[in-house]
C-alpha cells in the first residue's frame, strides 16, 4: 500500500474568514433578511452542499476531526488545570470519605460566594460531580504538580492536533483512495488505536497506577509515595509490592504466566477499601483487550495476499431468503460517509448507554461508588450522550437515503428488500407501540384506580397481585452463581448487583449491594420498552420513507429538510426526514427521562444510604420504591415532588445554584415550546408592525427582519 497524498492542494489564506458564507454563492452576497444568519449556521459545516467532489468532502471531514480533537484536548487541559489550581484534590486524596471533591471557587462579586459550601477539611467551594478526582486517583496522580504537567501536555497535544488539521488539508491532503482503503484502516484502527492504546494503558496501570494505589489503600501519605518515574526506573520498588516483578520477563518467555497473578488478577467484586473494581482486575482486562485487538488488527488483507477482504466477505454473505444479500453495501459504505457515520453512531450510542449502566454496577474508580451525586451525574450524562448519538444515527441514515442512495445499483439486496417491505415493518412496529403503550400504562392506571378505591389487595404489587420479572431475576441468579463454574479462581461475581454477595460499605456509606427486582421494576421496564419502541418507530419511519411515500412520491426532490409540500397540499407538513429526527428527539427525551427517574429513585430507595456500627442500613428514601412507584400518583408525589421540593427550597443556601438552574431549565423549556405552538404568520404580522414604527422614526434596519421559518422554529423548540 502506498499512502497517496496531494502536495499543497489549497493555499493557506485567512481571506475567506472575512467573507461569511464564502462556501455558498447565495450566502456570499450577504444578508438581505435575518434568515441569512440561520442559513449561515445551518450550512457552514454541510460540506455536501459546498461541493460534489467526494475527495474534497473527505478531506474537509478528516481535517475537521483534528480540530475536534484539539477542542477535546483544550477542554481536558482546562479540567486538569482547575484540578491543579482551584481544587482540594490533595486534601480529598488524604481523606476521600469525609472530604467532598471541589475544583471551583466562586468570586465574591454580588454575593455569589454563597455558592461556596463547606466541602470538608476547611475548604469552601462548589462540589463537583464529574468523577475527575476518582479517575485521577485511579491513574496514580498524587499531587497538584502532576495535574499541572498533564494540563500542559494536553495543550501541547491540542496544538499538535491543530497543526495536523492544517497540514493534512493544506500541505499533504490524502487522496480519495486512502479514505476508501478499508482493510488498511481496520488494521490500523484495531491494532493501533484499540490494541496499542489498551496496551499502553495496561502498562501505565501496572507500572504506575497499581503500586501508587496499593500504597494509598494502605494509608500511606501521598507525599511519602515515590514519584511515578521512580516505579518505572527502579524495579525493586515494584518487587516489594508485587514479588513477581523480581523475576522480570522470565515467566513470560517460559509461559509460566500464572507467576504474574499478583498484579494481573481475576477476583471479581469490589475492593472493600475503595468500593471500586480491583485495579489489578482492570489492568488484567486491558492487557487481555490489547492482545485481542492486536490480533484483530492483523486480520485484513493489505500488502500481502493473506487475510480477509471486506468486499468479498460482504458479497458472500447471502442466506436462502435474502436475495442478493449484502451485495452493493461495500460501495455504499465507501462512498457515503453519511451511511458509514449512521452505523458508527448507532453502535457508539448503544455502547455509551451500556457504559452508563456499568458505571454504577461495576464502579471502575476508587471511591466513585460512595459519591452518589457523581454516580447520578455520570449515569445521566452517558444516557443523554447515548440518546443523542442514536438519534444522530437515524439523522445521517436519512441524509444518506436522500443524498447518496442510488436505487439503480441496489437491486434485491438486503437494503432494497427492507425498503420494499417497509410498510410491513412500520405497521408491525406501530402495533407493538400501541400494545406496549396501552398495556404498560394500563397497569399503572389499574393501580391508581384500586389505590383510590382503597383496594390495595387488588393492586399489582409485591404484596398483592405479583408481576415478578422472572427472566431478569433468572439472569441475576445465573450471573451471581456463575463464577464458581466459569471462573473458579474468582472470589465474587462481576457485579454485586446480581445478588448473592454481601454489601460493600466504605466510610459508613453503602458502595453497592445486591439490587432486588420486583413488580415495580416490571411495570417501569415496560414503560422503557414503550418509549424506546416509539422512538425507534419515528426514526425508522423517517429513514425508510426519506425518499418517497404514498403521500409525497417525489419526496427525494424536496431534500432532507422541508416544511411542507408547497401550497395547496394540506396535511403534508412535518413529513420530511428532518422532521422525523425532530419528533424522534422528543421521544428520546421522553425515554431517557423515565430511565433517569427510575435509576435515581431505585438507587436512593434500595441501594444508597448509610450503615450503622451495628450493620443496619438506612436508605436515603427508606426503601419506598417497591410500594410507591407502582402508581402514577406515587411517581408524582413520592419522587417528582419529594425530590423537586428540596431543590426549590435551596434558595439562600450554597445549593441555590441548583434551584436556579431548575427554575431556569423550566423557563427554557417553556420558552422553546412557545416556538412550536405559535404560528409563523402571527410573528410576521407583529414584526411588520414593529418595522412600520421604525420606519416612522427613520431607524429602519438595513437587514429586513423575518419571522423564523417553520423548520427554524422547530429547531429552537426541540433544543
Swiss-Prot record:
GO-annotated molecular function: 4 iron, 4 sulfur cluster binding; chlorophyll binding; metal ion binding; oxidoreductase activity
Broad class of the protein's primary localization: plastid
Residues engaged in binding phylloquinone: 683
Documented EC number(s): 1.97.1.12
Catalytic class of the enzyme: oxidoreductase
Keyword Transport listed: yes
UniProt xrefs under SUPFAM superfamilies: Photosystem I subunits PsaA/PsaB
Positions with a binding annotation for chlorophyll a: 674, 682
InterPro entries assigned: PSI_PsaA, PSI_PsaA/B, PSI_PsaA/B_CS, PSI_PsaA/B_sf
Domain of life: Eukaryota
Compartment(s) of residence: Plastid, Chloroplast thylakoid membrane
Record note on cofactor: P700 is a chlorophyll a/chlorophyll a' dimer, A0 is one or more chlorophyll a, A1 is one or both phylloquinones and FX is a shared 4Fe-4S iron-sulfur center.
Residues annotated for [4Fe-4S] cluster binding in this entry: 564, 573
Family, similarity comment: Belongs to the PsaA/PsaB family.
UniProt xrefs under HAMAP family: PSI_PsaA
Protein role: PsaA and PsaB bind P700, the primary electron donor of photosystem I (PSI), as well as the electron acceptors A0, A1 and FX. PSI is a plastocyanin-ferredoxin oxidoreductase, converting photonic excitation into a charge separation, which transfers an electron from the donor P700 chlorophyll pair to the spectroscopically characterized acceptors A0, A1, FX, FA and FB in turn. Oxidized P700 is reduced on the lumenal side of the thylakoid membrane by plastocyanin.
Oligomer and partners: The PsaA/B heterodimer binds the P700 chlorophyll special pair and subsequent electron acceptors. PSI consists of a core antenna complex that captures photons, and an electron transfer chain that converts photonic excitation into a charge separation. The eukaryotic PSI reaction center is composed of at least 11 subunits.
Record protein name field: Photosystem I P700 chlorophyll a apoprotein A1
Species this protein is from: Torreya californica
Amino acid at each position: 500500500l502506498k499512502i497517496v497524498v496531494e502536495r499543497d492542494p489549497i493555499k493557506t489564506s485567512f481571506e475567506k474568514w472575512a467573507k461569511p458564507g464564502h462556501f455558498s454563492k447565495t450566502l456570499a452576497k450577504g444578508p438581505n433578511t435575518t434568515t441569512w444568519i440561520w442559513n449561515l449556521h445551518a450550512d457552514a459545516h454541510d460540506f455536501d452542499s459546498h461541493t460534489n467532489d467526494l475527495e474534497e468532502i473527505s478531506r474537509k471531514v478528516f481535517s475537521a476531526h483534528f480540530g475536534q480533537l484539539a477542542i477535546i484536548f483544550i477542554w481536558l487541559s482546562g479540567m486538569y488545570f482547575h484540578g491543579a489550581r482551584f481544587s482540594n484534590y490533595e486534601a480529598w486524596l488524604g481523606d476521600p470519605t469525609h472530604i467532598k471533591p471541589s475544583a471551583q471557587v466562586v468570586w465574591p462579586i454580588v454575593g455569589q460566594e454563597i455558592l461556596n459550601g463547606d466541602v470538608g477539611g476547611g475548604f469552601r467551594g462548589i462540589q463537583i460531580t464529574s468523577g475527575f478526582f476518582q479517575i485521577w486517583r485511579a491513574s496514580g496522580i498524587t499531587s497538584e504538580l502532576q495535574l499541572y504537567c498533564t494540563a500542559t501536555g494536553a495543550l501541547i497535544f491540542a496544538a499538535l492536533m491543530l497543526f495536523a488539521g492544517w497540514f493534512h488539508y493544506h500541505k499533504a491532503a490524502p487522496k480519495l483512495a486512502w479514505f476508501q482503503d478499508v482493510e488498511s484502516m481496520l488494521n490500523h484502527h484495531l491494532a493501533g488505536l484499540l490494541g496499542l492504546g489498551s496496551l499502553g494503558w495496561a502498562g501505565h496501570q501496572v507500572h504506575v497506577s497499581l503500586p501508587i494505589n496499593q500504597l494509598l489503600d494502605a494509608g500511606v501519605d501521598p507525599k511519602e509515595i515515590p514519584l511515578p518515574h521512580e516505579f518505572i526506573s527502579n524495579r525493586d520498588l515494584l518487587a516489594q509490592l508485587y514479588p513477581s516483578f523480581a523475576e522480570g520477563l522470565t515467566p513470560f518467555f517460559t509461559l509460566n504466566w500464572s507467576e504474574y497473578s499478583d498484579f494481573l488478577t481475576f477476583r471479581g467484586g469490589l475492593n472493600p477499601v475503595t468500593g471500586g473494581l480491583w485495579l489489578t482486575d482492570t489492568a488484567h482486562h486491558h492487557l487481555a483487550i490489547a492482545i485481542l485487538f492486536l490480533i484483530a488488527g492483523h486480520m485484513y488483507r493489505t500488502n500481502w495476499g493473506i487475510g480477509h477482504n471486506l468486499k468479498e466477505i460482504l458479497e458472500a454473505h447471502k442466506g436462502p431468503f435474502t436475495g442478493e444479500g449484502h451485495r452493493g453495501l461495500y460501495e455504499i459504505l465507501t462512498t457515503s460517509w453519511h451511511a458509514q457515520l449512521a452505523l458508527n453512531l448507532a453502535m457508539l450510542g448503544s455502547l455509551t448507554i451500556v457504559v452508563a449502566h456499568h458505571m454504577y454496577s461495576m464502579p471502575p474508580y476508587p471511591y466513585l461508588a460512595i459519591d452518589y451525586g457523581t454516580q447520578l451525574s455520570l449515569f445521566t450524562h452517558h444516557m443523554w450522550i447515548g440518546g443523542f448519538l442514536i438519534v444522530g444515527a437515524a439523522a445521517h441514515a436519512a441524509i444518506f437515503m436522500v443524498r447518496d442512495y442510488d436505487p439503480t445499483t441496489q437491486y434485491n439486496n438486503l437494503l432494497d428488500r427492507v425498503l420494499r417491505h417497509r410498510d410491513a415493518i412500520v405497521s408491525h412496529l406501530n402495533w407493538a407501540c400501541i400494545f406496549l403503550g396501552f398495556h404498560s400504562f394500563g397497569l399503572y392506571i389499574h393501580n391508581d384506580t384500586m389505590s383510590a378505591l382503597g383496594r390495595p389487595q387488588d393492586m399489582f404489587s409485591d404484596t398483592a397481585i405479583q408481576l415478578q420479572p422472572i427472566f431478569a431475576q433468572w439472569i441475576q441468579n445465573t450471573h451471581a452463581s456463575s463464577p464458581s463454574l466459569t471462573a473458579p479462581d474468582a472470589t465474587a461475581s462481576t457485579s454485586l448487583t446480581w445478588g448473592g454477595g454481601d454489601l460493600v460499605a466504605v466510610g459508613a456509606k453503602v458502595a453497592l449491594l445486591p439490587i432486588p427486582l420486583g413488580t415495580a421494576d416490571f411495570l417501569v421496564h415496560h414503560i422503557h420498552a414503550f418509549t424506546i419502541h416509539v422512538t425507534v418507530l419515528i426514526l425508522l419511519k423517517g429513514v425508510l420513507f426519506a425518499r418517497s411515500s404514498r403521500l409525497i412520491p417525489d419526496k427525494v426532490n424536496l431534500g432532507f429538510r422541508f416544511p411542507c409540500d408547497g401550497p395547496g397540499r394540506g396535511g403534508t407538513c412535518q413529513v420530511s426526514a428532518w422532521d422525523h429526527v425532530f419528533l424522534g428527539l422528543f421521544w428520546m427525551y421522553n425515554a431517557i427521562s423515565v430511565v433517569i427517574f427510575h435509576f435515581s429513585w431505585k438507587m436512593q430507595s434500595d441501594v444508597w444510604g448509610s450503615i450503622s456500627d451495628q450493620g443496619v442500613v438506612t436508605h436515603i428514601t427508606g426503601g419506598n420504591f417497591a410500594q410507591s412507584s407502582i402508581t402514577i400518583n406515587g411517581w408524582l408525589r413520592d419522587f417528582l415532588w419529594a425530590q423537586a421540593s428540596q431543590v426549590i427550597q435551596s434558595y439562600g443556601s450554597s445549593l441555590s445554584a441548583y434551584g436556579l438552574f431548575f427554575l431556569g431549565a423550566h423557563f427554557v423549556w417553556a420558552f422553546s415550546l412557545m416556538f412550536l405552538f405559535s404560528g409563523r404568520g402571527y410573528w410576521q404580522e407583529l414584526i411588520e408592525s414593529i418595522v412600520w414604527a421604525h420606519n416612522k422614526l427613520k431607524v429602519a434596519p438595513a437587514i429586513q427582519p423575518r419571522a423564523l421559518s417553520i423548520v427554524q422554529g422547530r429547531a429552537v423548540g426541540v433544543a
